[in-house]
Amino acid sequence: MTQAWWRDACQPLDNAAMDQARARQQQLTKPAGSLGQLEALAIQLAGLQGLERPTLDQVAITIFAGDHGVVEEGISAYPQAVTGQMLCNFVGGGAAISVLARQLQASLDVVDLGTIDAQLELPGVRHLRLGTGTANFARQPAMTENQLQAALQAGRDSAQRGAEQGAQLFIGGEMGIGNTTAAAALASVLLGCPASELSGPGTGLDNAGVQHKAEVIERALRLHGLRAEDPLQVLGCVGGFEIAALVGAYIGCAQAGVAVLVDGFICSVAALVAVRLNPQCRAWLLFAHQGAEPGHKTLLAALQAEPLLALGLRLGEGSGAALAVPLLRLACALHGQMATFAEAAVADRPA
């Protein structure tokens, strides 16, 4: 392993398993291609798992949480105290992702990377405390070098825990008041797009609030003079603890050979950073949905991603990815359990 571990090689896809899965799809009792994207998903999962007939029984969900200093600029409709309160809700079973995890029989891990409440102690939460939230990136870099490295490593550790526990699919979620502002700032630099095209309502800003949010981002980017060619510096300067942890988790999963289902806008920004740092990890990323944040469509296009759902979601927490899990499971079930023409004694199409 190199010191910059995120540059280390990711696991290769199993091309032989993909070829076998592709051949199987041609023999199932249906017109070729008639299940559309579900067929491609089954074939991709075959390559990721190294199995002709992949399954998705073991799903690991990790929520990364952290507060954001840029909230001082009045860019959120909610107070920062909500971040810590939602951690309690996650482990208490009352949050959307908590309900979804139960329904999916998925594991749910909650990681506190640094909220404004330095004394917060909740059973069932991993408290790492890299700081009481990031610094206000409208005035100074969001993270120190040590904080950035620790956040990346926290994500990698979560990926490794998932792999050790036999996870076949990893979902990263996030919680942090102000994190759509950090995500929009990151995307603005990496995509070369004006912040006004990427800034949305987040947790419920009105039009004036969205405009103010974009202005705060533009002012911060002028202050820091960031370049897309240095994604790590961009992440440390305007990102968040939880976004950096997602980056580390996505790369860590690809290095460990665990498929990732990416959630919404913030998670897609983390995926973009991960791919810029290690392009090999892109093959391990599946994209769950196109959300309501205006910048999400632009991000997905930049990642050449085909989202599975479009439900107008903007909750975060990994909720959109969790909602897409049944679709992936059904794709695997159809691929693995449908009869072939020979097995069902059904006439195949003429050669």
Curated annotation (Swiss-Prot):
<protein>
    <recommendedName>
        <fullName>Nicotinate-nucleotide--dimethylbenzimidazole phosphoribosyltransferase</fullName>
        <ecNumber>2.4.2.21</ecNumber>
    </recommendedName>
</protein>
<comment type="pathway">
    <text>Nucleoside biosynthesis; alpha-ribazole biosynthesis; alpha-ribazole from 5,6-dimethylbenzimidazole: step 1/2.</text>
</comment>
<dbReference type="InterPro" id="IPR017846">
    <property type="entry name" value="Nict_dMeBzImd_PRibTrfase_bact"/>
</dbReference>
<feature type="active site" description="Proton acceptor">
    <location>
        <position position="317"/>
    </location>
</feature>
<dbReference type="GO" id="GO:0008939">
    <property type="term" value="F:nicotinate-nucleotide-dimethylbenzimidazole phosphoribosyltransferase activity"/>
</dbReference>
<dbReference type="InterPro" id="IPR023195">
    <property type="entry name" value="Nict_dMeBzImd_PRibTrfase_N"/>
</dbReference>
<dbReference type="InterPro" id="IPR036087">
    <property type="entry name" value="Nict_dMeBzImd_PRibTrfase_sf"/>
</dbReference>
<dbReference type="InterPro" id="IPR003200">
    <property type="entry name" value="Nict_dMeBzImd_PRibTrfase"/>
</dbReference>
<dbReference type="Pfam" id="PF02277">
    <property type="entry name" value="DBI_PRT"/>
</dbReference>
<keyword id="KW-0808">Transferase</keyword>
<comment type="similarity">
    <text>Belongs to the CobT family.</text>
</comment>
<dbReference type="GO" id="GO:0009236">
    <property type="term" value="P:cobalamin biosynthetic process"/>
</dbReference>
<comment type="function">
    <text>Catalyzes the synthesis of alpha-ribazole-5'-phosphate from nicotinate mononucleotide (NAMN) and 5,6-dimethylbenzimidazole (DMB).</text>
</comment>
<keyword id="KW-0169">Cobalamin biosynthesis</keyword>
<keyword id="KW-0328">Glycosyltransferase</keyword>
